[in-house]
Amino acid sequence: MRDGQARYLALGGAIGLALCVAQPRATRAQDWSGNAEGSTTDGPTVEQYMKDAGPNLKFFAYGSLKIDGKLVNCGKRPTVMNPNFDSWGGAFPGFLILNSKKIEGLSTQVKLYIYSHECGHQFEGPDETKADLFAIRRGVKWGWLDAQGMEDICTFISQLKGDSVHPPGPQRCETMRKYYQELIEAGTQQAGSSSPYDTQAQTLGPAQ
């Protein structure tokens, strides 16, 4: 534990501004729209986060979270629902964060995109494009992403402005849309399965 007062920093996805919440450990939350500070390699444990992040949190062990009735997982990583989180979602090493209030009005496929984008940061680090493509690849492979869902994601992401670490929302939309079309045209639901982060059956395998 580091001495002195420190902060968790979340980049507000909708407005692209950094919002700070006082916490006892100096680190940064990887919000779903990205952060170049390497928060997937340093941060609190889920126990520390649950203790320090305030009231109304809800913990979901891996394999227990459902989004609109659909069971989701990010390997063996748990998820914390935090209705007061500054963005739609976030990630520290080993666990994900979703803002239950912010995602409430979104379509199912956009919610799954946000969750999968955060999961992508666990494997890909802070790179925005890689996390976006991880989410699209997972959506195609796992069968929850269709053409309408891709358009919903684009509508949602296109409102975001770019900054030093975020490509502009419309650019992200086009990158994801192009990749989605490539996956569909390739006729494979197993795109990228040779990559270690895509060969995931962790919830069916033995605990380590």
Give the positions of each predicted feature.
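Short alpha-helical catalytic segment bearing the HExxH-like zincin motif
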Residues: V110-E118
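Sec/Tat signal peptide C-region and signal peptidase I cleavage site
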Residues: Q23-A29
